[in-house]
Design a protein with these regions (language model features):
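Intrinsically disordered, low-complexity
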Residues: 1-46, 138-148
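Aromatic- and glycine-rich peptidoglycan recognition patches
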Residues: 26, 73, 77-90, 110-148
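Short alpha-helix boundary/capping motifs
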Residues: 29, 57-58, 128
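Short acidic-hydrophobic sequence patches enriched in Asp/Glu that either
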Residues: 31, 59, 135
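Catalytic cysteine-centered active-site loop
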Residues: 38-96
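Short, structured active-site "lid" loops
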Residues: 102
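A conserved glycine-rich beta-strand in the N-terminal activation segment of trypsin-fold
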Residues: 105-108
């Protein structure tokens, strides 16, 4: 039994190590589409102001920070500071994986005119991570490219 458990643990551990290595290595080869795909898997999870958990509750800037951290990018924690992250671009140049910063809010552009973000408004009763189809639903301050 001990040998079987150790073998099982080793296989499990190796799988996790491989996964972590591939994620860490992805920091340099990440694509905007990969960022959006990763971010989108958390849709429906709760909004918590000041939260840092993609599964148990997070706010808008924490969401952006944690999604990019998965790919090896270190972003500031608050949206105002995220407005200076990466490289400034125009909205017309934007593509999937770029971030859009509003007054007091930040989101990840999906490339189809929409955003994925942690919001404290509908459709989820107490807000949550969601997709919104109109990135220009309110005036924005900056569009930034994190993944080149």
């Amino acid at each position: 039994n001990t040998t079987e458990n150790n073998d099982s643990y080793t296989e499990e551990s190796s799988g996790n190590d491989y996964e972590e290595e591939s994620n860490a290595g992805g920091g340099y080869s990440a694509t905007g589409e990969a960022v959006v795909a990763y971010a989108s898997q958390f849709i429906g999870n709760p909004y918590v102001y000041g939260g840092n958990s993609l599964t148990n509750g997070i706010d808008c800037s924490g969401f952006v920070q944690q999604v990019f951290a998965h790919f090896g990018y270190s972003l500031p924690r608050v949206s105002d500071a995220q407005a200076g992250a990466g490289r400034g671009i125009s909205y017309s140049e934007s593509r999937a994986g770029d971030i859009i910063v509003y007054s007091g809010h930040v989101a990840i552009l999906t490339g189809d005119g929409g955003i994925v973000h942690a919001s404290n408004s509908a459709p989820y009763p107490q807000g949550g991570i969601k997709y919104s189809s109109n990135a220009l639903y309110r005036p924005y301050i900056a569009v930034r490219r994190i993944v080149d």
